Amino acid sequence: MKNKLYQALLLIFLVAGISSCDYLDIVPDERPTEEDAFKDKNAAERYLYSCYAFMPKEREGCYLYQGGDCLTDYDRKFLEGTHTAANIGDFAYWSRMYAGIRRCYTLINNVDAVPRMEEELKIIYKAEANFLIAYYHFMLLRAYGPIIIMDHEVSVSSTEKLKRSPFDVCVKWIADKYDEACNNGLLAVQSSSYYGRATQLAAKALKARLYLYAASPLFNGNSFYANSSLYDPETNEPLMPLDYNCLLYTSDAA
């Protein structure tokens, strides 16, 4: 009986001793930090490319529909009407696009501190990041309508309460963001070594597409939204334009 008591006490002391050790809580030295991402020119370039990594493909998810129905439960959700903006798999952009937006702001806020990096290159990187911020907001707008505009970097631990902006406000903000990129360092043409990176032509083309979508009857005066829940919870003002305007954005597009 005494031996069992001694064994129990010994076990308690051992567990207490192990739990008090903090040598397992040390962050590994090789784990990258934000400072590592901007420690030199090459690291900054890698970080810029990581900002592009959030771009979705226009055909994303299409290969799922080339297989049998047994491969996915998408068809079942469609038939049952249980699809929502949050559970559409490869087509759910919300978290992914906002993660990309935050990364772009991180680059903008830190690239100036990169040592031995040409000032002109820093300006180009920030312009490309602004282009991506506009593009990611556009993808969100296309998928969800009125969205939360992120005009600054928000900490992952932030408790800031954010709300959706009216559709026309979102459109103007995105268009202005494309203009900001074009007017502040975005290259007219990229060299063949940087094929696929943002250019002024891409920004202007996407701005035109933004206006095309916004002026279409899908978003412009669609009566479907009159009875929806797309209203500002504080002012009770509609977030979607309820009256059709055939001249909407014509002066801006010109």
What are the residue ranges of the model-derived segments?
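Membrane-proximal, proline-rich intrinsically disordered regions
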Residues: C21-Y63
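Conserved small/polar residues in nucleotide/adenosyl-binding loops
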Residues: Y249-A254
